[in-house]
Structure formats: structure tokens, C-alpha cells
Regions:
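Bacterial N-terminal signal peptides that target proteins for export
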Residues: 1-8
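Acidic, polar-rich low-complexity tracts and alpha-helical solenoid repeat scaffolds
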Residues: 19-224
Length: 224
């Protein structure tokens, strides 16, 4: 029995050592993809969602007033989320450090790309807007030509646009929105892009155009 335990441990050790991030083999990619997903990334994503839920459950919306397009925390409210967002940042960094697989200039682990987007979103909720823009720019620059990263690149562009608007730089948001908005988008992305346009025009003081986009977003809103 002791022999089999030692043999199993030795085989497992050889497998783990063999699954290097420097080898572009299917088994290596799947090992690091699975490990990143179900360990660090999962925990970081859960921490982020817990933080968002905590804020949304405490936030009381006044339905007698015009509701905001987005239910985001202000700078003071964001401090309550710091511990959850910091955990998301920590776990995302762990994914990137331990599971990044770059070959011929392209990232092969989709959860590394997702980890960068989680970093951007966590920074956004912490009101660290410059760092949010840096993370979004990195995603666009490094993964913009990778098919498996199309989803994350879209959300990074949208988040960058929203961040610019919140910083009072609406002029910088328009090209990002224009670049994101296409008829080929999924229903969810199409709706979110319309909503972002409404936010852009509203914050720019162009109320008639904002109203048009709010109406369009209302028509494409998902039904529960």
C-alpha cells in the first residue's frame, strides 16, 4: 500500500512538473486553464460579486425620483467594498503570475485575460479610475488581436468609456463606444452598449440624444 502511495505521489509530481507554462502543449494549456479557473480566478470573481451584491443590497433606490442608469457606489460608499475588491485583485494577480502562457506573442490561457478584466472592474469599483484605464488599455493592446479574448476586449472598451465619462472626459469615451457598437453584438452586449451611449449623452448634457438611447436600451433590456 505504501509503495502504491509513493508511486502515485511520484507520478502526480512528474505530471505537475511537466505542466510547465513554458510548453505550448494541449495538456499544459488545459492544466493551467483549469487550475486558474477553479482556484484563484473563481475565488476572486466570487469576492468581486460579493462586494457588488453587498452594495446593491444596502443601496436604497428612491423610485419616486428618476433612477440612475447605473447603480454604482460613490467614492464614500466604495470604501465598504475595498476588502472584497482587494481580494479580487489579489486572486487575479495570482492567476496572471502562476498561469500565464504566452507563445508567439499571444496569450493562450483565457483565464489570464479574464483576470485582467477582473482587475479593471475591481479598480473601477474602488474609484481607482486611472488604474482602471491602464488595465483596460492593457487588455486592448495585448489581447485585441486574439479571438478567444474578443469578449473581454469588448467589456474593457465599454468600461474604459464609462470610466472616462465618470472622470469628466466624455470626449475620450466616444471613439471607444463607436468602436464597440456593431450589429454583430450579442443581445446582452448590444443592450449594454446602448446603455453606455445613453450615459455618454446624458453626462454630456445632450438630453434629447440621451433620451433616444435610453429608449433604445429599454427596448433591448433583458426580460427576467
Amino acid at each position: 500500500m505504501q509503495y502504491f502511495r509513493l508511486a502515485f505521489s511520484a507520478c502526480l509530481l512528474l505530471f505537475l512538473v511537466g505542466c510547465s507554462t513554458t510548453k505550448d502543449k494541449w495538456v499544459n494549456r488545459k492544466y493551467h486553464e483549469t487550475t486558474a479557473h477553479y482556484n484563484a480566478y473563481f475565488n476572486g470573481f466570487e469576492a468581486f460579486n460579493d462586494g457588488v451584491r453587498t452594495f446593491e443590497e444596502k443601496e436604497k433606490l428612491n423610485f419616486e425620483e428618476i433612477l440612475p442608469l447605473y447603480n454604482w457606489p460613490n467614492e464614500k460608499e466604495a470604501t465598504v467594498l475595498f476588502s472584497k475588491m482587494d481580494r479580487a485583485l489579489e486572486k487575479s494577480a495570482k492567476v496572471i503570475k502562476g498561469h500565464s502562457m504566452v507563445f508567439k506573442g499571444k496569450q493562450k490561457n483565457p483565464y489570464v485575460v479574464k483576470a485582467y478584466l477582473l482587475i479593471a472592474r475591481s479598480r473601477f469599483y474602488k474609484h481607482e479610475f486611472i488604474k482602471t484605464l491602464e488595465a483596460c488599455a492593457y487588455i486592448q493592446d495585448q489581447f485585441g488581436n486574439i479571438k478567444m479574448a474578443e469578449e473581454e476586449v469588448f467589456w474593457a472598451k465599454l468600461l474604459a468609456a464609462q470610466t472616462h465619462i465618470r472622470m469628466g472626459n466624455a470626449f475620450a469615451a466616444e471613439p471607444l463606444l463607436d468602436d464597440s457598437y456593431t450589429k454583430k453584438l450579442s443581445k446582452t452586449k448590444f443592450h449594454e452598449a446602448q446603455k453606455a451611449y445613453a450615459f455618454y449623452y446624458l453626462e454630456s448634457g445632450r438630453l434629447e440624444e440621451a433620451q433616444n438611447w435610453v429608449s433604445a436600451a429599454f427596448e433591448t433590456a433583458p426580460t427576467k
